[in-house]
């Protein structure tokens, strides 16, 4: 039995291929940054976006503040209609005579009409600057007094002026809507 050589198991075996020998330590570059750094960057980006949005909203709020806060057309009509029904055709305002504000202020001063000058002025501005009022200003249309009687007719110059005003008001309304959209976004 001694003649037969049995294979002996060893723990250290020689590999058949050659392994490269390292002469130095290799440097491994990690491509992903640590989680804390990623979180910090995201928070910084979010804070920058929020600051930019806040600045944009503040600028929009400041730009929106230059426009008058007039009541709506319905509120203005409901303010004036109980005391001067001749100025309205149903719920739509008629074209007002020139100098009607002074006449209305005089009526408020002499009568028992509980309207302040400011409220009356704002209601008249809301009516005369409305799109429906300016669209109705065509050459030959009638202007009415407080009793509902015709006083004069619209001239060509007044019609041209109304068209300019209408363009300006539509442009302002478009700008206002854009600014309001900026304020409403989150």
Curated annotation (Swiss-Prot):
Coiled-coil segments: none
Cystine pairings recorded for this chain: none
Keywords, in A-Z order: Conjugation, Plasmid, Repressor, RNA-binding, Transcription, Transcription regulation
GO terms for MF: RNA binding
RNA-binding in keyword set: yes
Record has Repressor as a keyword: yes
SMART domains given in the database record: ProQ
Database matches in InterPro entries: Fertility_inhibition_FinO_N (IPR021065), ProQ/FinO (IPR016103), ProQ/FinO_sf (IPR036442)
Transmembrane spans: none
Gene3D superfamilies in alphabetical order: ProQ/FinO domain
Region of interest: Disordered: 1-20
Purpose: One of the components on the FinOP fertility inhibition complex, which inhibits the expression of traJ gene, which in turn regulates the expression of some 20 transfer genes. The transfer genes are responsible for the process, called conjugal transfer, in which DNA is transmitted from one bacterial host to another. RNA-binding that interacts with the traJ mRNA and its antisense RNA, finP, stabilizing finP against endonucleolytic degradation and facilitating sense-antisense RNA recognition.
Family note: Belongs to the FinO family.
Protein name according to UniProt: Fertility inhibition protein
Annotated organism of origin: Escherichia coli
């Amino acid at each position: 039995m001694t003649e037969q050589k049995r294979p002996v198991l060893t723990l250290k075996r020689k590999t058949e291929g050659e392994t490269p020998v390292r002469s130095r330590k290799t440097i491994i570059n990690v491509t992903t940054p640590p989680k804390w750094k990623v979180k910090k960057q995201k928070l910084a980006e979010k804070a920058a976006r929020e600051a930019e949005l806040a600045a944009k909203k503040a600028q929009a709020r400041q730009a929106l503040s230059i426009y008058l806060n007039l009541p709506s057309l319905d509120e203005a009509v409901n303010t004036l209609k109980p005391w001067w029904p001749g100025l309205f055709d149903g719920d739509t305002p008629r074209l007002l005579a020139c100098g009607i504000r002074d006449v209305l202020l005089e009526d408020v001063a002499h009568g028992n009409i509980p309207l302040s000058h400011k409220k009356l002025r704002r209601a008249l501005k809301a009516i005369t600057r409305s799109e429906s009022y300016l669209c109705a200003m065509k050459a030959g249309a009638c202007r009415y007094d407080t009793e509902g009687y015709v006083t004069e007719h619209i001239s060509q110059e007044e019609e041209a002026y109304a068209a300019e005003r209408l363009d300006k008001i539509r442009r302002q309304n478009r700008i206002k809507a854009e600014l309001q959209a900026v304020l409403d976004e989150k």
